[in-house]
């Protein structure tokens, strides 16, 4: 599929308090049309700075930007991209933010209509003209229905909940039929329930409109809910990027693993083991295993297989299965009991089946 966003070897530098700061360093990111692409990192990682180069709200120092096949920035071969051309380009990229930036003195309806005040369309002769008042009103009405706010059109921002305010911001961001929607920490100010509702809305809009979504966040749970691809940033650099499924199945960087652990109930269970006597109570011929598996592996009776093949017994302490992009991912925490030879054979079987596992409680003495 064709990339709608190409950021090639981008660097962003600026002076702050008398020193040169490199906010983004040699970052390359290609986002395909129709992606929901999560860019995750802690505060100061450079993720917002990077993504704001997409519509040139932040001008890079070095590198190249190509949007929908059009080069809009090239540090080696400068591109003239200013004035009316830049304004028209930016209309095709919607943005929502952590803070909703609504106009307090305007109604919900007029907040959305505000984004249409300079909007133009082509007439049947190919000439551009401004929208009529009726066309603007019809467009706003359509957008408010799309974000489930049709019955709140005459309300003011002060009368709305946080989730409703963000819905207004989303409607406003969609006013000019953008091909790209950027969410810059768009759920950070919301409670968990409202966050899920907004993510469901973004997913629905993505499906209905075919819009490409770029999701900036410091929360892996947000990425996990709706993204199909992920880039992880640290200290201005993209340290890892892949499909959501591959990131969760085979994370390479320590930071990526940390982010994944924040979304995993199995990791919370493992962390709680230190407060129990479970590890101390393991028999001499048993050990505690954490096992991860995904996709077709879930269809195979792995635990049943090892008990039959290798003369070991198991006791499951924890189990969980969840879906990522429609693909199941599972975790087990279980004891493996048997002779050292048989336990070693069972673990070799895990390796043979390409299952990820770790020994949580490893014994020093075995009884054969």
UniProtKB/Swiss-Prot annotation:
Main location: membrane
UniProt entry tagged with the keyword ATP-binding: yes
GO cellular component, one term: plasma membrane
Pfam families: ABC_tran (PF00005), NIL (PF09383)
Cysteines paired by S-S bonds: none
Keywords: Amino-acid transport, ATP-binding, Cell membrane, Membrane, Nucleotide-binding, Translocase, Transport
Listed EC numbers: 7.4.2.11
Gene Ontology MF term list: ABC-type D-methionine transporter activity; ATP binding; ATP hydrolysis activity
EC top class named in words: translocase
Top-level lineage group: Bacteria
Domain ABC transporter: 5-260
SUPFAM superfamilies recorded: ACT-like, P-loop containing nucleoside triphosphate hydrolases
Binding-site residues for ATP, renumbered to this chain: 41-48
InterPro entries: AAA+_ATPase (IPR003593), ABC_transporter-like_ATP-bd (IPR003439), ABC_transporter-like_CS (IPR017871), ACT-like_dom_sf (IPR045865), MetN_ABC (IPR041701), MetN_ABC_transporter-like (IPR050086), NIL_domain (IPR018449), P-loop_NTPase (IPR027417)
SMART domains, per the entry: AAA (SM00382), NIL (SM00930)
Recorded topology in the membrane: Peripheral membrane protein
Reactions accelerated catalytically: L-methionine(out) + ATP + H2O = L-methionine(in) + ADP + phosphate + H(+); D-methionine(out) + ATP + H2O = D-methionine(in) + ADP + phosphate + H(+)
Record keyword ATP-binding present: yes
Location of the protein in the cell: Cell membrane
Family of this protein: Belongs to the ABC transporter superfamily. Methionine importer (TC 3.A.1.24) family.
Role noted for this protein: Part of the ABC transporter complex MetNIQ involved in methionine import. Responsible for energy coupling to the transport system.
Subunit record text: The complex is composed of two ATP-binding proteins (MetN), two transmembrane proteins (MetI) and a solute-binding protein (MetQ).
Name used for this protein in its record: Methionine import ATP-binding protein MetN
Organism: Lactococcus lactis subsp. cremoris (strain NZ9000)
Gene behind this protein: metN
């Amino acid at each position: 599929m064709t990339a709608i966003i190409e950021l090639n070897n981008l660097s962003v530098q600026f002076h702050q308090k008398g020193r040169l700061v490199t906010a983004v360093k040699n970052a390359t990111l290609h986002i395909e049309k129709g992606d929901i692409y999560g860019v995750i990192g802690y505060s100061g990682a450079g993720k917002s700075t990077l993504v704001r180069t997409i519509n040139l709200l932040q001008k890079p120092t070095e590198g190249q930007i190509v949007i929908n096949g059009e080069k809009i920035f090239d540090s080696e071969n400068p591109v003239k991209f200013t004035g009316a051309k830049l304004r028209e380009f930016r209309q095709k990229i919607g943005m929502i933010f952590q803070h909703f930036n609504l106009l307090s003195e305007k109604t919900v309806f007029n907040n959305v209509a505000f984004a249409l005040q300079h909007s133009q369309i082509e007439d049947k002769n190919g000439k551009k003209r401004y929208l009529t008042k009726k066309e603007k009103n019809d467009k706003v009405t359509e957008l408010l229905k799309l974000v489930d706010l049709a019955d709140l059109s005459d309300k003011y921002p002060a009368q709305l909940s946080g989730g409703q305010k963000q819905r207004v911001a989303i409607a406003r961001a969609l006013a000019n039929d953008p091909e790209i929607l950027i969410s810059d920490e768009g759920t950070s100010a919301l409670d968990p329930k409202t966050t899920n509702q907004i993510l469901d809305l973004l997913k629905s809009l993505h499906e209905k409109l075919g819009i490409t979504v770029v999701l900036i966040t410091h929360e892996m749970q947000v990425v996990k809910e709706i993204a199909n691809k992920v880039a992880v940033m640290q200290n201005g650099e993209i340290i890892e990027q892949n499909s959501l499924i591959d990131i969760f199945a085979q994370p390479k960087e320590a930071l990526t693993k940390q982010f994944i652990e924040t979304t995993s109930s199995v990791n919370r269970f493992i962390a709680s083991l230190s407060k129990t006597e479970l590890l101390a109570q393991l028999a001499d011929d048993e050990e505690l295993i954490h096992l991860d598996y995904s996709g077709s592996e879930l269809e195979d009776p792995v635990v049943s297989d090892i008990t039959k093949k290798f003369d070991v017994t198991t006791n499951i302490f924890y189990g969980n299965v969840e879906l990522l992009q429609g693909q199941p991912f599972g975790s087990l925490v279980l004891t493996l009991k048997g002779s050292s030879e048989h336990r070693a054979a069972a673990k070799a079987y895990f390796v043979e089946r390409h299952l990820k596992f770790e020994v949580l409680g490893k014994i020093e003495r075995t009884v054969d």
